[in-house]
Amino acid sequence: DPQQRKTVMDLVKDVCPERIYPVGRLDRNTTGVLLLTNDGDLASKLTHPKFLKKKVYHVHLDKNLTSHDMDQIREGITLDDGEIKADAIEYADDRDKSQVGIEIHSGKNRIVRRIFESLGYRVTKLDRVQFAGLTKKNLRRGDWRFLTEKEVDMLRMGAFE
């Protein structure tokens, strides 16, 4: 980090002797699932859009998302770098329309924030709850764990979405 701020790599710097690096990215203001690996082929398979690895986010907005805007996101919206549409989008809580769950497979930088910003919303909180079938279940913010052998095998076989 050019500003010498703590990064996720600081949390795992002494974990293993191999060089590890993040698969994809989360910006500073986003929490959630981030996979680290020393396997470049696996990283490529998980990040390239042609492999359609899904990412699911819980999004908090500064105001209620209208059903019209939700439909637009489903059908596709045009951003500076092309069209994007959600694979799925729903209200996270029917009583609070400012929270949505969105599933995408694009790896474009800040894509979730840019989708909502293009429609006049501000993302106040963004949490990636799933990546390629992996969740953060039972992990607190800042905690990490090694993948099980079964999870690694499933990722290598492409069995996770």
Q: What is each stretch, according to the model?
A:
Residues D1-E161:
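Basic, flexible Lys/Arg- and Gly-enriched helix-loop patches that mediate nucleic-acid binding at interfaces
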